[in-house]
Curated annotation (Swiss-Prot):
May associate with CD21. May regulate the release of Ca(2+) from intracellular stores. The keyword Acetylation applies. It comes from Rattus norvegicus (Rat). GO terms for molecular function: calcium ion binding; calcium-dependent phospholipid binding; calcium-dependent protein binding; cholesterol binding; GTP binding; identical protein binding; ligand-gated monoatomic ion channel activity; lipid binding. The modification Phosphoserine is found at residues 13, 422, 537. It is found in: Cytoplasm; Melanosome. This is Annexin A6.
Amino acid sequence: MAKIAQGAMYRGSVHDFADFDANQDAEALYTAMKGFGSDKESILELITSRSNKQRQEICQSYKSLYGKDLIADLKYELTGKFERLIVNLMRPLAYCDAKEIKDAISGIGTDEKCLIEILASRTNEQIHQLVAAYKDAYERDLESDIIGDTSGHFQKMLVVLLQGTRENDDVVSEDLVQQDVQDLYEAGELKWGTDEAQFIYILGNRSKQHLRLVFDEYLKTTGKPIEASIRGELSGDFEKLMLAVVKCIRSTPEYFAERLFKAMKGLGTRDNTLIRIMVSRSELDMLDIREIFRTKYEKSLYSMIKNDTSGEYKKALLKLCGGDDDAAGQFFPEAAQVAYQMWELSAVSRVELKGTVRAANDFNPDADAKGLRKAMKGIGTDEATIIDIITQRSNVQRQQIRQTFKSHFGRDLMADLKSEISGDLARLILGLMMPPAHYDAKQLKKAMEGAGTDEKALIEILATRTNAEIRAINEAYKEDYHKSLEDALSSDTSGHFKRILISLATGNREEGGENRDQAQEDAQVAAEILEIADTPSGDKTSLETRFMTVLCTRSYPHLRRVFQEFIKKTNYDIEHVIKKEMSGDVKDAFVAIVQSVKNKPLFFADKLYKSMKGAGTDEKTLTRVMVSRSEIDLLNIRREFIEKYDKSPHQAIEGDTSGDFMKALLALCGGED
C-alpha cells in the first residue's frame, strides 16, 4: 500500500484485506484458472479486494506453490481490456508505470499523452522507483530511451522531470516567489520569442507549495493565470506538458478527474488511459478524484464508468472506484471549497479577450468591391474569392465595402450575394455582412417567427451581450422591424421566462465592482429560492423576483462574489443547484447567465461543441456563434474548446461540415491549435 504521510488521512479506495492469507488466495486463483474456461468473477473479486503489496505476496506464493508465474497465467486465461486491467493491478506501481512508458515509446509513433500524464504527476520518490523499475525490467536506461524518442523543449522538460529533484514542500522563499514571477513574465509576455529554459527550470524544480504561491502572485501581477501565458507562449506537446505540470501542482486529483472524464466522454472510450489512472490512483487519491469529479461534472465517476463500460471489465473498474457518490446526492464540502478558491482567483483575473478576425492591413474598399463584383459576374460564381475577401475583413471594413459597391455599381451587395450563393454558406456570408446589432436583431426575430419559438437562441443572445450591445440591438430591432424588441418578446413568450428575457433586454445590468455585504444578501436569496437555506424568509413569489433581479441586473464581478458566497454558505455550486431544482426555459436562462458570468468563452465553446456533436449539425447555432464572436473572443473560445474537449474547433469543423461552408468557417476560426 502507498506510504501515507504522518497524520494524513488515507484517500485511496482499495485497502489491505483483513485476515489476508497469500497461500489461500494463490490457491483460489489457481482453481479459478484450472480446467476449461476461467472463473473471471472470482479473479476480479479477489484481485480488486487486495492491496498492491498483498498482490505481490500472492504472486510469490503462487510461484512457490505451483512453480508458475501468476501474471503469465492471467495473461493466458484472460483477454482484451479486462486482461490489461488485471495484469496492471498485479504489477508493483513502479513496474506498471515502466511498462506504460515502454509501450508509449515502442514501435511507430509515440504516445505523448501517456508520457505527459505519468511524468507530470508522480512524486520524486515515485519517479526514482520508476527509473529503477525500468532498468530492472528492460535492462535499459529510461532517460536515454526518452531522449531517443522525443525532441526539443518537450524532451528537455521530460528529462528534468525524470531527475525527480523537485524541492520539498517545506522549501518556500517569499523573495524567490517574486523573482520567479518576474522571471516567468520576462521569459514569456515581455520577450519577443519565449525563453523556454526559464519555464523549464522554474516549473520543473520548485516545490509545489512554492509554485502555488508563484501562480497566485503571477495572476495578481499580470492579470493572467499562468495557464493563459503558457498557451500564448508555448506550443505543441511542450505546451501540453507544461499545462499538465501546472494542473498537477494546483491539484493532482483534479488533473486526474479531468483525464478520466475525457477518457470516457464522446464516442468510444480511451481504455488505456482509464485503466492506467484507475490502477495507479486506487491506493493514493481515488476518493479525492471522485469528489472533484462529482462536483465538476455533475455525475459520479461510478455512474460514468457504469454507463461507458461493460462485462467483467466494468465490474473490476467499479470495484476500484469504490462507491457511487450519486447515491448520497450531496456535493462534497472539500470539492465545494475547490470551487470557492477558483472564484477567489477569478476575482483578480483579467483575461484579455481576442477575436480571430481583425481589420485587414492595406485595406482598399474599392479593390474589394471590384473583386466581389467580378466574382459574381457572368456564368458561375467564384465562391473562393467571396470567402477570402469577406472573412478577412473586419465588420467595419465590410460596411465600407457595401457602400463602395453601391457607389461604383449602383447595386446592393447584399442582394447580389443572396442571388449568387445559397444554403449554409449564404447564411454565414450574409451574417458577416450585417452590422453586429442588426445581425443579432435578425437572429432574435427569426427565433420568434413562425410556429414555435427557438428559446435557446433567445437565451444565448440576451444572456451574453453587454449593456452597450443590448441597447444597439434594441435600436436595430426597432429600425428593421418597426416594433420594439420588448413587445416582440412579450407577445412570443410567457410567464417567468418572459420576465427574465425582458429584464435582460433592457440592457440595465450594473457595471461596477462587487459589494461584499450585498453579495451575502444576494447569496441568501439564492439559497432560499433554491430551497437549500436553513431559514427561508418571505413568500416565494417575492423571492423569485429578487432572484431574477440578482441574476439579471447585478454586475459580473458582483455575481462572481455572489456565487462564491453561495458556496461558502451552502457547500453547493449555484449552477448545479439551478439545474437540479429548476426546469424548462427558466432553468436554461438562469444556467446560461451563470455560465456566462463564470466564463463566457467556455459558454460559447460548449455551444460550438454541441452544435457539431452527434448525428447531424446544428448549422444555425454554429453560424451564429462563429459570426457573432469572430471579432470579440473567438480566440479565447478556441482555447476553452481544446482544453475541455481535447480537440480543436478547426478539427471539429473539418469533421462535421464540408465544401465552401467549411472553408468559410475555417477562415473565421483563424487557425489550427
